[in-house]
Amino acid sequence: MTLDDIENNNNDHGQFMPMYDEGVNFPSYSNNFQPLKIEKNDKEDRQVTCSIVLFVLGFLLLIPWIINVINIKSKNKMARGFSIASVVLFSLSIAIIVIFVIFFIFLITSLHNSHREDR
């Protein structure tokens, strides 16, 4: 195939060969893939781990739930969620304990008073 054949849009097989102007820009098909940069934030990971541990320990003891308030202003949503859940569960637990204590105080005093009246 010669330059004249190309200019005349003919090749050896008689098929049309398109001509392109030199000023035409064609898209580049090179691989421009950039891997996603993952920055591990150790501080946030520690906050989440600490928050989860305190949340789980709160079921055994009440104190870890109130200690978990340290993560309530965390930028990490998961740490903040566990912290809020811990504070809510701590409040509910204290309310239930107070109700039971008041109930038992009334129960004991009423039993004590009824026992006195029986004498």
UniProtKB/Swiss-Prot annotation:
Keyword Transmembrane: yes
UniProt membrane topology term: Multi-pass membrane protein
Transmembrane segments: 52-72, 88-108
Main subcellular location of this protein, as a coarse class: membrane
Presence of keyword rRNA-binding: no
Any one GO cellular component localisation term in the record: membrane
Protein name: Uncharacterized transmembrane protein DDB_G0281147
Disulphide bond pairs: none
Subcellular location: Membrane
Key words, A-Z: Membrane, Transmembrane, Transmembrane helix
